Amino acid sequence: MIILGFESSCDETGVAAVCTERGLLAHALHTQIAMHQEYGGVVPELASRDHIRRVVPLTRQVLAEAGLTLADVGAVAYTAGPGLAGALLVGASVAQALAWSRALPAIGIHHLEGHLLSPLLAEPRPEFPFVALLVSGGHTQLMLVDGVGRYELLGETLDDAAGEAFDKSAKLMGLGYPGGPALARLAEQGDASRYDLPRPMLHSGDLDFSFSGLKTAVLTRVKAATRDGGELGEQDRADLAAATQAAIVEVLAAKAIRALKQTGLRRLVVAGGVGANALLRAHLARALKPLRAEAYFPPLSLCTDNGAMIAFAAAERVKAGLADLREGDHAFTVRPRWDLADIQAG
């Protein structure tokens, strides 16, 4: 079965075609970074309008690249939440309209499930069960993944997500949008040892996270440097960026390793936008060697929000018998706030 998937939860419009037997056939993505840069963050109304402009051309592109027509599509999938309500409605509306016009089933997918399963798109493919570290601008969670639809929350952030800590710290340093990648680039030129920043909850013994204290520490350093009309010098900024990144990465890696030890597993999947961070990848590769454990990452192109992970998650649900393939009445809802535990397979 060929599934056409749509992602529109925030500021990326993604469309992809996935075959349940052959895997990913084609995917296309448009990011709105340039549009939101002048505002320093995502403007929900602008995001929704841009999704409307992009989704049909991207759909045509994917079908052409895969050598498909709509007659070849057996089901459609879309991100049903969590995310921005207006943005979610664009992808859901297009998917449901297409499903209605072709008498196809429409499968609503949890955005985080898409991220959790995205490393399975790459080779080598991790076998179940595994521990998943989900790190993005909006979420930081450790999950035990026993199979498709079988997820147990092991720990999560109690305040800011890791990606949010990157972005907010970058903003305090006067870096551009999006802040996380800008901070990571600048950190390459810095000396992390110049600033002693806290590692919140590093030794808490549990698997939860907290990054608000780190953000406050960065603010304190910036205020100290800019007191009495001073400014944060370029090298100081690079050093502070390096120290901030090192603190976040150390906490993420330590908690992930603790999760592996507590579960007795030796497979760690890292997903979400922060999973593209080069220091995190290198740090985990070193830290996992003594455990004889393996880390699995999605391709860099699939770390950000994308349609491939949505279509693929739908395909995995179909193969696991967890998707309702009956043609429905195509009434639908989106869920801007949606707990991953609500989609358990039982």
Curated annotation (Swiss-Prot):
Top-rank lineage group of the source organism: Bacteria
Entry annotated with the keyword Aminoacyl-tRNA synthetase: no
Localization in the cell: Cytoplasm
List of residues binding Fe cation: H111, H115, D305
InterPro entries found in the cross-reference section: ATPase_NBD, Gcp-like_dom, KAE1/TsaD, TsaD
Keyword Metal-binding annotated: yes
EC number, UniProt record: 2.3.1.234
Main location: cytoplasm
Binding site for substrate: L134, V135, S136, G137, G138, D167, G180, N277
Keyword annotations from UniProtKB, A to Z: Acyltransferase, Cytoplasm, Iron, Metal-binding, Transferase, tRNA processing
EC supergroup of this enzyme: transferase
Alphabetical list of Gene3D superfamilies matching this protein: 3.30.420.40
Cofactor field: Fe(2+)
Family: Belongs to the KAE1 / TsaD family.
Function of the molecule: Required for the formation of a threonylcarbamoyl group on adenosine at position 37 (t(6)A37) in tRNAs that read codons beginning with adenine. Is involved in the transfer of the threonylcarbamoyl moiety of threonylcarbamoyl-AMP (TC-AMP) to the N6 group of A37, together with TsaE and TsaB. TsaD likely plays a direct catalytic role in this reaction.
The protein, known as: tRNA N6-adenosine threonylcarbamoyltransferase
Gene giving rise to this polypeptide: tsaD
